[in-house]
Amino acid sequence: MANAKEIRTKIASVQNTQKITSAMEMVAASKMRKVQDNMAATRPYAENMRKVISHVASGSLEYKHPYLEEREAKRVAYIIISSDRGLCGGLNSNLFKRALTDMRQWQEKNVEVDLTLIGSKAISFFHRFGNVIAQTSGLGDKPKLEDLLGAVTAMLEHFDDGKIDRLYLVYNEFVNTMVQNPRITQLLPHPDKDESQDSKPNDATSRWDYIYEPDPKDILNALMLRYIESQVYQGTVESIACEQAARMVAMKSATDNAGDIINDLQLVYNKARQSAITQELSEIVAGAQAV
C-alpha cells in the first residue's frame, strides 16, 4: 500500500484534472447551444433545397442536367467531414469506420475512390487512404460557405470532367445531445428517391412538371450548384454541433469518473492514515511497557 503522502499527491492530481474536465464541459455546453441555433437556422433551407431537387428530378424535364443523370460507377468520391479537435468520445472514429466500410464495398468491385477531407481529424486519418483531391480545416464553430467552396468546386469539376461518377457526403447527423449518427448520403448524381423522404410512389405530389423561365439550363445549373453547397454546408454545421455535444458528454463522464477515483483514493488514504496511527500507538505502548 502506498504511503499517505503519495496518496495525497495523487488525489490532488486527480482533483486538478477534474477541474479541467469540468471547465471543458461547461465551455462545450455553451458552444453547443450557439451552434445548435446556427444549425436550426440553416436546416430548413437545406431540407427544402433537397425537396425541390427531388421534385425536379422526378418531373418531366425539358433539359436533363448532368447531375441528375445516372451513369456507370467507375470511380467514386467522398466528402468526409470531421471535427478539428479531439476529446469528443467516439464521434470521429465511428464516422471513419462507417466511411471505410462503404469505401471497401466499392474497392471490392475494383472501383477507385477519391476523397475530399474537411476537418483536421479526417485529414490526419485518411491521408493514407485513396486519392485526396482537396482538404480544408480550421473552420471554427461558425463556418463560412466561402471556406468550403474550394473543396466543393474541386469535386464538381472532377464530376463534370467525368473523372468521378458518384459523389457522397459523409458527416455526423445531430439527433439530440446524446445521439449523433454517422451518415452517408449520395449527392451526385441525385438519387431518384430522396433518402430523407418517405413519399409514396403513387403520391400525386411526387411528380411535378415545371415551366422554366427564361431558360431551364441556366436555372438548373444555378439550382444544382446551390443544392450541393447547401448540403455540404449543412453537413458541416451538423458535424460541429455533434462535436460540441459529444465533447460535453465526454467531459461530463470524465468529471464523474474523476470524482469516483477521488472517493476511492480518499478511502485508501484514510485506511493508510489509520494504519499509520495504529502502528504509532502500538510502538508507544510497547515502549511504555518496556520502561
From Swiss-Prot:
Keywords: ATP synthesis, Cell inner membrane, Cell membrane, CF(1), Hydrogen ion transport, Ion transport, Membrane, Transport
Record organism: Photobacterium profundum (strain SS9)
CDD domains to which the protein is assigned, alphabetical: F1-ATPase_gamma
Stretches with biased composition (Basic and acidic residues): 190-201
Molecular functions per Gene Ontology: ATP binding; proton-transporting ATP synthase activity, rotational mechanism
Matches recorded under Pfam families: ATP-synt
Oligomeric and partner information: F-type ATPases have 2 components, CF(1) - the catalytic core - and CF(0) - the membrane proton channel. CF(1) has five subunits: alpha(3), beta(3), gamma(1), delta(1), epsilon(1). CF(0) has three main subunits: a, b and c.
Residue ranges of the region described as Disordered: 187-208
Cell membrane listed as a keyword: yes
UniProt keyword annotation of Cell membrane present: yes
Biological function: Produces ATP from ADP in the presence of a proton gradient across the membrane. The gamma chain is believed to be important in regulating ATPase activity and the flow of protons through the CF(0) complex.
Topology term for the membrane: Peripheral membrane protein
Intracellular or extracellular location(s): Cell inner membrane
Main location: membrane
Database matches in InterPro entries: ATP_synth_F1_ATPase_gsu (IPR035968), ATP_synth_F1_gsu (IPR000131), ATP_synth_F1_gsu_CS (IPR023632)
Gene name of the encoded protein: atpG2
Protein name: ATP synthase gamma chain 2
Highest taxon above the source species: Bacteria
An annotated GO BP: proton motive force-driven plasma membrane ATP synthesis
Record-level GO cellular component terms: plasma membrane; proton-transporting ATP synthase complex
Family recorded in the similarity comment: Belongs to the ATPase gamma chain family.
